[in-house]
Structure formats: structure tokens, C-alpha cells
Amino acid sequence: MAKKFQITLAQLNPTVGDLEGNYKVALEAWERAKKVGSDLIAFTELFITGYNTQDLIKKPSFFKAAQDQILQLAKACRKGPAIAIGGPAYIEDKLYNAYYILADGNIANVIMKHHLPNQNVFDEKRIFDEGEISGPYQIGPIRIGSPICEDAWHSDVSE
């Protein structure tokens, strides 16, 4: 087992709808994490799109552009720390609030948010589909779990 595993937490302030700007912020943060020897940099929920996108995420052109930014980030950051970053996922005609694990120039794993809030300013049940509970993923020798926001408050999501 590794003697150390360094994680950089990138609790930044993405701008809703500014995919290119959020990509640039993520890339700059990744470069800083690489300089300090991190093994993983973790961004927030829906970082690439900003949170909360409301109906903007349902526009096919916006969703495709968000996916393109995630793929571009994976390729640009293939030599250095892995990336955990929030973004939308569209699988089998369902739209998910997802968390992408990027490593070695590829999407290594995708975690879907399971518990969707639906109170006060949160309207996720109208926008997203509920994902299956995802288990941990592997970064080098380490198994990591990344519950997405509300998921962290429910014991059924953790292993």
C-alpha cells in the first residue's frame, strides 16, 4: 500500500453556464495540484456546468458541450493527478447528476447521484434521474468513495 496519498480539494466557485471558464479554472487548479504532488484533485458537484443549472442542462447543445469539456479535461490532464469532477451524464435516455473520475487521459469511472433533493431551492427530482448506488473506485492502490452532496447524508450510499 502507498505510504501517502495526497488529495487536493478544489472548493472553488464555478459559474453556472460558463463551461469554458469552468474548464479553465479546473485546468489551473489541476496544474497547481500537480506541482505539489497530489494524486487526486477533487472538485465539487456539477463543477463543469456550475450548480444549479435548472433547465439549461436539458438543452442538448449545452449537455454535449459539457461532455466535450470533461473529455478535453481528461485528455489535457493525462499526466498527473487523477481528477474527480462533477458534471451531467446522459445514459440510456436518462440524465444524471454525476461525478467523473478522470485518469490517464480517459474517463475511468462515473458515479451517479442517488438521493436527489427536492425541497426549498432544490429541484433535482424534476431535472435528473436517480442513479444506482455506486461503490468505491480505484486510484492507484487506494479505494475511494465519493458520495455526491445529499448522498453523504444517507447511510445506504456508503460501503
Which functions belong to the PLM regions below?
Residues 1-159:
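Enzyme catalytic cores with a strong preference for nitrogen-chemistry domains
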